């Protein structure tokens, strides 16, 4: 993997990631394909509206269907028929979300499979080995997702464990002679000194890119923005900056303005299935009775398949009846909206007009929910 920084507009960055499998223009948004599938979408549909890279989850794939099943096809790309790059999450977040069913030690985490209750152990080495077998183009280190809220002593202890695991992840990645990219993950909760310490240690270890973890875990928007105000500048300018698990369209705009290059989030797909649709003027809750006889299109500014062919009334009907087509049409629109938003931001940075873009974006987003 190679990253080229092409242009900056204040702190906002316009770049390109070059993989053997193709190029990814940044800032970039990755739809989440947890089990090797972006829900309701074919790979061809994803590509058609600008998706360049997707995210898979090594924890879930290792349990279902199992790494042996994926390897029987070749790798994860072959298994799901996706021709572009794939980033895989290490599984750290998922393991720690199991709560009382898992036990953390210096070596790693013991837990029971959410599938059948079987005992499983996962540490940095196991996670890196799984991601190598999946053929991930970007491998993530295994870390502890710091709980929120937590006192500073707890956050510090968690961060130090993650840093030791980061070194072990790097050592295993090198031992396997994996030529694909490996990203570190900055932790440290809401504490600036700990975040800066985490970033500095990861830079010293040496990674191909750096992710910011431990955000969008329950903190306020103000707390998240405060971290983004100082943290990106602590990371090397020639390396990718990835904000994990974020977020709303407004979150993406704020983060790009502060120097973030990559994002992933389940929001556009999950919200689509629940009838929350992102538009140029705000969120449309398509189940609302007001749309029963509304024959207008969802978003007059959108050129997606859904907006070119169907009315709000029809989408309302599909959502009320829980029709599979409704989930598909909603997902097509939300993902198209996200990818078009990223395209607009890339163009704004290229033309040194990001501030103008941001002002117009907020002027249009006049309502949170319609």
Curated annotation (Swiss-Prot):
Q: In which pathway does it act?
A: tRNA modification; tRNA-queuosine biosynthesis
- Which residues are listed for substrate binding in this entry? 89-93, 143, 187, 214
Q: Where is the active site?
A: 89, 264
Question: What's the domain of life for this entry?
Answer: Bacteria
Keyword annotations from UniProtKB, A to Z? Glycosyltransferase, Metal-binding, Queuosine biosynthesis, Transferase, tRNA processing, Zinc
Instruction: Return the protein name.
Output: Queuine tRNA-ribosyltransferase
Oligomer and partners: Homodimer. Within each dimer, one monomer is responsible for RNA recognition and catalysis, while the other monomer binds to the replacement base PreQ1.
From the UniProt record, give one GO term of the biological process aspect: queuosine biosynthetic process
Pfam short name (any one): TGT
Which gene holds the coding sequence for this protein?
Answer: tgt
What species is given as this protein's source?
Vesicomyosocius okutanii subsp. Calyptogena okutanii (strain HA)
């Amino acid at each position: 993997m190679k990253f080229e920084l092409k242009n900056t507009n204040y702190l906002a960055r316009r770049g390109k990631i070059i993989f053997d499998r193709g190029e990814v223009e940044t800032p970039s948004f990755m739809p989440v394909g947890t089990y090797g599938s972006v829900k309701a979408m074919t790979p061809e549909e994803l590509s058609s509206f600008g998706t360049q890279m997707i995210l898979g989850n090594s924890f879930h794939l290792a349990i279902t269907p199992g790494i042996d099943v994926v390897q029987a096809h070749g790798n994860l790309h072959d298994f799901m028929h996706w021709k572009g790059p794939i980033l895989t999450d290490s599984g750290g977040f998922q393991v720690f979300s199991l709560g009382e069913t898992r036990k953390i030690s210096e070596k790693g985490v013991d837990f029971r499979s959410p599938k059948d209750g079987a005992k499983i152990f996962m540490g940095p080495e196991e996670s890196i080995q799984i991601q190598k077998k999946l053929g991930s183009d970007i491998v993530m280190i295994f870390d502890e997702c710091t709980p929120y809220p937590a006192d500073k002593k707890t956050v510090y202890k968690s961060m130090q464990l993650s840093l030791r695991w980061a070194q072990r992840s790097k050592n295993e990645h090198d031992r396997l002679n994996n030529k694909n990219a490996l990203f570190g993950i900055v932790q440290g909760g809401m504490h600036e000194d700990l975040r800066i310490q985490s970033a500095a240690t990861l830079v010293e270890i040496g990674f191909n890119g750096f992710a910011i973890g431990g955000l969008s875990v329950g903190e306020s928007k103000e707390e998240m923005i405060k971290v983004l105000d100082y943290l990106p500048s602590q990371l090397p300018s020639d390396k990718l900056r990835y904000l994990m698990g974020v977020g709303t369209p407004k979150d993406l705009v704020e983060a790009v303005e502060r120097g973030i290059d990559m994002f992933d989030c389940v929001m556009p797909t999950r919200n689509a299935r629940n009838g929350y649709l992102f538009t140029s003027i705000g969120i449309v809750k398509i189940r609302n009775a007001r749309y029963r006889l509304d024959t207008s299109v969802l978003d007059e500014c959108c050129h997606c398949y859904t907006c070119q062919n169907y009315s709000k009334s029809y989408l309302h009907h599909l959502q009320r009846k829980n029709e599979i087509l409704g989930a598909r049409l909603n997902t097509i629109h939300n993902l198209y909206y996200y990818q078009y938003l990223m395209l607009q931001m890339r163009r704004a940075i290229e033309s040194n007009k990001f501030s103008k873009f941001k002002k117009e974006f907020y002027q249009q987003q006049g309502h949170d929910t319609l």
